[in-house]
């Protein structure tokens, strides 16, 4: 969220699930006065990430494009958001991905003209399946940001991340 705010990305919508009330309290305290909205996936325990994405998309105000960043990837650099933004074509619906060592990573910047299709997509593989249907719209930009690799799924990963970045 810090990197997004430093780039001027606003508003930011956060979809909450497990321990959502605790996380909401922390975010409200830390980001008081920012354009941060929180919505809930109350069925998080029985649904997938695509469901949370659809809930978030249903809550965002009209926009030209939006970044999609899972909450367990907290250290994506400001420069990555800016590079992906600059790579986005102006007049063509596109999905711009940062790449690291040739792999597509988060956060993609997605043209808002894809929102209705995402909201109605029920195919296999979640959004990966959706991307495959829209390969012709994908734009990539190489970045040098280990934050694009940093995925915190365990407490051990979280601890290493805190040690590295807050040191």
Where do the language-model regions lie?
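Short beta->alpha linker loops
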Residues: 18-19, 44, 48, 79, ...
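Active-site phosphate/pyrophosphate- and oxyanion-stabilizing loops and adjacent acidic/basic residues
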Residues: 25, 54, 82, 128-129
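Conserved N-terminal catalytic core of the sugar/cofactor nucleotidyltransferase
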Residues: 1-64
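Conserved alpha/beta core of the MobA/IspD/sugar-nucleotide pyrophosphorylase nucleotidyltransferase superfamily
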Residues: 116, 120-167
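Hydrophobic packing residues within well-ordered alpha-helices of enzyme cores
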Residues: 23-27, 84, 118, 161
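Active-site donor-binding loop signature of nucleotide-sugar glycosyltransferases
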Residues: 41, 100, 112, 143-145, ...
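Conserved beta-loop-beta/alpha segment of the NTase-like Rossmann-fold superfamily
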Residues: 37-38, 45-116
């Amino acid at each position: 969220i810090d990197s997004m705010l430093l780039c001027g990305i606003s508003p930011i919508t956060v979809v909450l699930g497990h321990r959502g009330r605790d996380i909401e309290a922390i975010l409200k305290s830390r980001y008081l006065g920012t354009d941060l909205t929180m919505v809930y996936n109350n069925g998080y325990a029985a649904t997938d990430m695509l469901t949370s994405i659809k809930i978030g998309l249903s809550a965002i105000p009209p926009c030209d494009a939006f970044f999609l960043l899972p909450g367990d990837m907290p250290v994506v650099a400001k420069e990555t958001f800016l590079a992906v933004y600059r790579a986005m074509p102006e007049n063509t619906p596109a999905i711009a991905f940062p790449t690291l060592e040739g792999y597509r990573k988060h956060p993609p910047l997605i043209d808002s003209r894809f929102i209705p299709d995402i909201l109605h997509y029920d195919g296999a593989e979640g959004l990966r399946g959706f991307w495959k249907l829209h390969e012709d719209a994908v734009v990539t930009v190489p970045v040098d940001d280990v934050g694009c690799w940093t995925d915190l799924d365990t407490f051990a990963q979280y601890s290493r991340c805190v040690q590295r970045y807050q040191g």
